[in-house]
Amino acid sequence: MRKTKHIIRDIIGYCYYNTMKRFQNIGNRCLIYHAFGTRLKHDSYGISININKFKDQMKFLNDHYKMTDINDFSSDDVTISISIDDGYKDTNDAINILNNYNIPFTLFITAGKINQKGYLSETDIYNISQIKNSIIGTHGMSHNRFEKMNYSSQFKELKDSKLILQNIIKEEINITSYPHGSFDKNTTGILSKLGYKWAACSKKGFNSFSTDNFLLCRSEIIASDTIIDLTNKIKGYYDYY
């Protein structure tokens, strides 16, 4: 059944790409990763990827694309940026690989999980922030959905996470990603009030100078993705869903 679903997905993706996306493939494609070997509860989707597979993917990307920051739209060609959500402890393993290839990355950290078992420590986060190609951003306090919160709860999540991380890295933080890709009409106004300049969501697509700063598109990479799947996601085969 799973194989059949993949075949159907790929057929639809091929048709979508060739009719809608082939001539729109300019800009930055940001990829989302989460965990790198950690066994996560209820991970039926496969967001925890084998670290060796991640290494192979980074080598492939570095060999075939220009790698840039998530908010760098200066190239006239397709560029790739890497983002990592949540802040699991095994993020350190992924960052060692990114650093070896000199690949820029953005790390979005759930501030309420810092120092907990299985998550990055304050020392980890500070050390990561000192890497030349790193950007540190917030990912809420609790990893709950913003669209399920009232205004004051959202404000507190975005403010507290910002202050906690700024205190750790001793630098201004102006970027966030929405937990579960969830936000509502209040969220962007709160971001502006708190001094955020960028926010990443879960909408798929290319980013450019015309992209809303608070709706940066990202495409999720999961454990079952092959290099072909990775390439197709970059091209936009699956942007239709």
Placement of each model-derived feature along the sequence:
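Generic detector of well-ordered alpha-helical packing
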Residues: I11, D86-G87, G140
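Short, function-defining helix-loop hinge/capping sites that tune catalysis or transport
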Residues: D93-A94, E147, T226
